[in-house]
Swiss-Prot record:
It is found in: Secreted. This is Japonicin-2. Expressed by the skin glands. Its main location: secreted. Disulfide bonds join C14-C21. One of its GO terms (biological process) is defense response to Gram-positive bacterium. Keywords: Amphibian defense peptide, Antibiotic, Antimicrobial, Disulfide bond, Secreted. Antibacterial activity against the Gram-negative bacterium E.coli and the Gram-positive bacterium S.aureus. One of its GO terms (cellular component) is extracellular region. It comes from Rana japonica.
Length: 21
């Protein structure tokens, strides 16, 4: 539960900020 979320959050943030992942 915890590990998948940690890997998904950074990707979601860079997409929302329109930054290169």
């Amino acid at each position: 539960f915890g590990l998948p979320m940690l890997s998904i959050l950074p990707k979601a943030l860079c997409i929302l900020l329109k930054r290169k992942c």
